């Protein structure tokens, strides 16, 4: 379990996540994240909560359980959705019919962060990931426009299991195959969730 690691390598591997959290906490009004899947440990949940405690408007868009192309990411989101919502973040579930794979962050109206980092333990601890930070209102505006196009095919998840659906999005149906796959992963493979 990467949470138990205390080696110097662990400190370096967590730098991208740490720097992202610190950057997001400095936002004046808004943080918007897009990630294909979200698989966090306690350290990462604490980071998200600290951002939500510092900034009024924090949202995240990720694939819905049925729309996610990564069965492990789908199963982990299914199991941990309430914990994610418990950080205070607004979660939007993408229902576009194909798995969304964007990885970007908007901070206020000038900072854009684009790269290869998923909000998951694999990106934080195992893989070599990069995120480019750009201070430009023009790029921020263009990225926001692109992100909003995807968000118009998403529903906002509520803690009680219901959804706000301002764009009248029809959710992707969870296939029986995906449901069986998720049950297997949930029961037998989530112990290795930091590898997914």
Locate predicted features.
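Primarily the HKD phosphodiesterase
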Residues: 21-87
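Short, low-complexity, Pro/Ser/Thr/Gly-rich segments in the mature regions of secreted, periplasmic
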Residues: 187-195
């Amino acid at each position: 379990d990467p949470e138990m690691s205390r080696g110097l390598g662990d400190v370096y591997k967590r730098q991208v996540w740490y720097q992202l959290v610190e950057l997001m906490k400095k936002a004046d009004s808004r943080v918007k994240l897009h990630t294909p899947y979200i698989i966090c440990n306690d350290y990462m949940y604490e980071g998200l909560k600290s951002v939500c405690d510092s900034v009024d408007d924090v949202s995240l868009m990720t694939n819905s359980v049925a729309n996610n192309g990564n069965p492990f990411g789908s199963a982990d989101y299914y199991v941990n959705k309430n914990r994610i919502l418990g950080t205070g973040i607004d979660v939007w579930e993408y229902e576009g019919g194909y798995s969304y794979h964007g990885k970007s962050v908007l901070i206020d109206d000038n900072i854009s962060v684009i790269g290869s980092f998923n909000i998951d333990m694999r990106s934080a601890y195992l893989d070599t990931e990069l995120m480019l930070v750009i201070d430009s209102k023009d790029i921020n505006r263009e990225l926001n426009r692109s992100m909003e196009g995807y968000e118009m095919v998403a529903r906002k998840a509520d803690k009680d299991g219901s959804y706000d659906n301002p764009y009248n999005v029809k959710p992707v149906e969870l296939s029986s195959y995906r449901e069986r796959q998720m049950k297997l992963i949930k029961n037998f493979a989530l112990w290795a969730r930091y590898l997914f």
